[in-house]
């Protein structure tokens, strides 16, 4: 049985396709193009003719504007890393354009790579001394410094001069993460690398260096310390005074345990604290065994205990049994099947050799 073809309905997408009051709306006429190729050509020819017939004074006024735009585009194309290589570069280059600073950086890097000490001194000496006042830690677009170029080229004299003037190398790396000493070693100049590493190479000012921790005295431990973690150390926690403790307080450790015997052998008396002068905590710190790989707080923590296993209990040193892999199980099953087949064959041969 054939079904009649259904008429598909296409929704209107244009206001002119709509029907209004039983009548279809008229189609709007397409606007004709008011500009053809000949008219556009005539317009541009007239524009060019007006520029060529302009007076010389107007042309001289437009040329500096074009030159300024061209210079502005050339400056904007310079890498931002070269413009703000370091804060010191900005201080040394005050009053100097970015383009001049870029040229100065390349001159310094080239002089350092070629080992030209007179040119290097002229570029790095301050203006008061008759030099160019260049930055000794200037960087190019690849973050190479003069010290890196001199070390990579094996120019020992230039490296010694730059280090003597305070060139930084500690923590100063190029884009690949290599410093001046590593570049010298890769190029086959171990003497230059050793010269760099034996220098100071401090990149931080003295006021920004982290102060050395001062020596402090702990009354509870009766000792001097410099470590900031001393307050949370086990020795300090055991020495903390918890007030007078009754002498018959149970220690929580059996008398037969090796730890208790070591305490007695060291001069400790039962009922006294565990500190250096027999004061502080009288009981050991309870602990919780951690023998799984689950994260902390994954399950509720068990009860802390001082002694987890009785004496001579092998569970104290027993490791966690590793479940066998699938390959190991398959290999064992195969060995068991082969052994069973060999036993069956042996029994069969024995049975057939019997004489009744």
From Swiss-Prot:
Residue spans of biased composition, Low complexity class: 77-88
Region (Disordered): 1-98
Ranges annotated as biased composition (Polar residues): 54-63
MF term (GO), any: nucleic acid binding
Reported effect, residue 314 to N: Found in a clear cell renal carcinoma case; somatic mutation
Pfam families: Ank_4, G-patch
Keyword list, A-Z: ANK repeat, Isopeptide bond, Repeat, Ubl conjugation
SUPFAM superfamilies: Ankyrin repeat
UniProt ANK repeat ranges: 111-141, 142-172
Keyword match Ubl conjugation: yes
Covalent crosslink: Glycyl lysine isopeptide (Lys-Gly) (interchain with G-Cter in SUMO2): 290
Compositionally biased spans, kind Basic residues: 67-76
G-patch domain location: 255-301
Name this polypeptide is given: G patch domain and ankyrin repeat-containing protein 1
Gene from which the chain derives: GPANK1
């Amino acid at each position: 049985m054939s079904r009649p073809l259904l008429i598909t309905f296409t929704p209107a997408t244009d206001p002119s396709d709509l029907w209004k009051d039983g009548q279809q709306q008229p189609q709007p006429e397409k606007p004709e193009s008011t500009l053809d190729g000949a008219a556009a050509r005539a317009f541009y020819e007239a524009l060019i003719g007006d520029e060529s017939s302009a007076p010389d004074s107007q042309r001289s006024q437009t040329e500096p504007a074009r030159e300024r735009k061209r210079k502005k585009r050339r400056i904007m194309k310079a890498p931002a890393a070269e413009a703000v290589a370091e804060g010191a570069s900005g201080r040394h280059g005050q009053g100097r354009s970015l383009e001049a600073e870029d040229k100065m950086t390349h001159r310094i890097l080239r002089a350092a790579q070629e080992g030209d000490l007179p040119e290097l001194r002229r570029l790095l000496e301050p203006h008061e001394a008759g030099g160019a006042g260049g930055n000794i830690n200037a960087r190019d677009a690849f973050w190479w410094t003069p010290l890196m170029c001199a070390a990579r080229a094996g120019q020992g004299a230039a490296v010694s001069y730059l280090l003597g003037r305070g060139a930084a190398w500690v923590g100063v790396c190029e884009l690949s993460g290599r410093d001046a000493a590593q570049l010298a070693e890769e190029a086959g100049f171990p003497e230059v690398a050793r010269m760099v590493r034996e220098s100071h190479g401090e990149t931080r000012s003295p006021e920004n260096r982290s102060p050395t921790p001062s020596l402090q005295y702990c009354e509870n431990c009766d000792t001097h310390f410099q470590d900031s973690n001393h307050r949370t150390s086990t020795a300090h926690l055991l020495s903390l005074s918890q007030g007078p403790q009754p002498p018959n307080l149970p220690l929580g450790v059996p008398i037969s345990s090796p730890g208790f015997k070591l305490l007695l052998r060291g001069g400790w008396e039962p009922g006294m604290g565990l500190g250096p002068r027999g004061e502080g905590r009288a009981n050991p710190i309870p602990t919780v065994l951690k023998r799984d790989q689950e994260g902390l707080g994954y399950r509720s923590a068990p009860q802390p205990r001082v002694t987890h296993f009785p004496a001579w209990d092998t569970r104290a040193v027993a490791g966690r049994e590793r479940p066998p892999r699938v390959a190991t199980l398959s290999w064992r099953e195969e060995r068991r099947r082969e052994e069973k087949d060999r036993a069956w064959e042996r029994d069969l041969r024995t049975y057939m050799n019997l004489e009744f």
